[in-house]
A protein has these predicted regions:
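Positively charged n-region of N-terminal signal peptides that target proteins for export
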Residues: 1-11
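Pocket-flanking alpha-helical
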Residues: 78-119, 225-228
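Short, P/G- and charge-enriched loop/turn segments at secondary-structure junctions
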Residues: 120-125
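Bacterial signal peptide processing site
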Residues: 21-23
Length: 284
């Protein structure tokens, strides 16, 4: 009986010690949750006509705040951009200041224009994006006293004015060539006579006028607005046609979906308000 009581006492002590040990053990703590690393933003590479520099840079700031992307722009003449794309430059989205340069990259375009059979434009992405106006601008004070395109044509014929225009592979230069042809003026003869000078893109022409190194220049309405230049006349459709800016995602795009999403945004109300504030308009 004594042995039995001793065994019970021993067991009771074992259970008591076990309970004490259990209560003394520190409470388990959960490991702090770690946040998943943020995804790297996608880079969208946009090749755009130089005349869109100010508006697209403004839109970039807005768009990047609300989307996990970084936008890298390459602004230049549409002809230069087309050549860079053709030579293999990385580009997701192309916005041209003229149909010709886009057509030269579009396999569905007239073969007389796309003479190399280039196939860069992604199916179903090409749109007529914006419309601009071709205008005649003068430096401060209008030193040549120009009154409009009719007056310009007469003074060019007489050699009494010095005009800046885009060269032949720049859309604004091609529009100017149409204006000269409208007035039956010989561009080559004018160049040889020293009455016209050239810029490699519309920004160069704008700068020549702003600095007063020429009597006038033919540029886009939007560039005149951005540079604060005086517009004395606007070209009609009969003079140079409609000035349409096409845009398209490219087949070689590394971030095609992000580029398409950005193009969709550019056609929306928020972005269009910025374009319209400087003289662009939706295509009618």
């Amino acid at each position: 009986m004594k042995k039995f009581l001793a065994m019970l006492l021993a067991l009771a002590m074992v259970f008591a010690l076990a309970a004490c040990g259990q209560s003394a053990a520190p409470a388990a703590t959960e490991a702090p949750a770690t946040e998943a690393p943020a995804e790297e933003p996608e880079e969208i590479i946009v090749f755009a006509a130089a005349s869109m520099t100010e508006t697209l840079n403004q839109i970039k700031e807005i768009y990047e705040k609300d989307h996990n992307v970084t936008i890298t722009y390459n602004f230049d003449s549409s002809g230069t951009l087309k050549t860079q794309i053709q030579e293999g430059a990385d580009c997701d989205l192309f916005i041209s200041a003229g149909q010709k340069q886009m057509n030269q990259l579009d396999i569905t375009a007239d073969k007389e224009i796309n003479t190399d059979g280039l196939d860069f434009v992604a199916d179903g992405t090409r749109i007529n994006f914006l419309e601009n106006k071709v205008v005649l601008v003068v430096p401060e004070g209008n030193p040549a006293g120009l009154e409009g395109f009719d007056d310009l044509a007469a003074k060019l014929a007489d050699g009494n004015v010095f005009m800046a225009m885009g060269n032949s592979d720049v859309p604004v230069g091609q529009y100017t060539q149409k204006i000269l042809a409208y007035y039956d003026l010989d561009e080559e003869a004018l160049a040889n006579a020293g009455t016209i000078t050239y810029g490699t893109n519309v920004k160069e022409v704008t700068t020549q006028v702003s600095e007063g190194s020429v009597d006038c220049g033919v540029i886009y309405c939007t560039d005149a607005f951005s540079a604060g230049l005086t517009i004395i006349d606007s070209a009609t459709k009969d003079m140079c046609g409609q000035v349409i800016y096409p845009a398209a995602v490219l087949k070689t795009a590394q971030h095609a979906e992000a580029a398409q999403a950005f193009l969709d945004y550019l056609t929306g109300d928020e972005a269009m308000a910025i374009f319209e504030s400087v003289g662009f308009s939706p295509v009618a």
